[in-house]
Amino acid sequence: MFKGVLLLAFAASSLNLGAAVLTPEQALARVNSQAPMKLKGKALTSYKLSYTAVEDGQNAVYVFSQPADGKGYLVLSADDCADAVLGYSDSGNFDAQNMPEPMVWWLGEYARQIAAARNSNVLKAVERPERKPIEPMLKTTWNQDAPYNMMCPLINGQRSMTGCVATAMAQIVNYHQWPVQGVGSYQYFYNNSWISLDYSKITFDWANMLDSYADGAGNERQKTAVAQLMYACGVSVDMQYSPAESGAADLFVASGLVDHFNYDVNVRYAERDYFGLLDWEEFIYNQLTEYGPVQYSGSSSIGGHSFVCDGYSEDGYFHIN
């Protein structure tokens, strides 16, 4: 199982000159010279290889974890065409046998980017500007199952998941503790029936939303408070509900916030394809400093995920909740 938060370089395409497949030992050795601030001085010999992502028949990404106390893991490039440390957690744990879909997707995307870099004739080092660090803003560690999905539709007797888009959106709305009451109403047709919600009758119970509902935490009122918010977010983005996984497009989040949560009309949806790497990082950084947590998503031919970016470390890693 994956728990905790992860700090990530936004792209494996922050490339260095050269391209050579590395053994796990070589990949770990690179960390000594390129370690993020929080990892400097740590005994890396305590980290053990837990997972290898393979792309085009070659190792692309290694995950090393702390077997002793289960706290902390490293996501390393298996090729010197990319930064040594792609991401890390100094508190979470990593179980390769029980990885959630978001983690599977992240590692797969890094592997595909590194494989693409190997096949590219243009390898260029990226020089990032110095920026002030931003401490992680979210306190919540919410998920998609119970109690968060208590109000989601039942399909064949099974409760639907909230969906990652709704879960990310709900955590941001909870961060701002806004609005007190919803706006308007909305309905859409899905799975041979109409899903509808009158937002004007919803009063959000912010005071009773817990930062975590792990291990059965929360009384009935506290569980209902977060479930109501999750469902309100899901309906606003035309969530395609399912007990296995629920899906929606992030591009609907902005209109949902404006139309039913009374957010500013200037809330916007932006795509990475229209920015250069450094311009995109600057754009996200500025959003964090000016407006708070940013909902971020990524997708490929095999799927996608939505999550929250809510901080930035002094050595250039974005904090992902």
Task: Name the predicted role of every residue range.
Residues 85-246:
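Active-site-adjacent structural segments surrounding the nucleophilic cysteine of cysteine proteases
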Residues 15-19:
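Sec/Tat signal peptide C-region and signal peptidase I cleavage site
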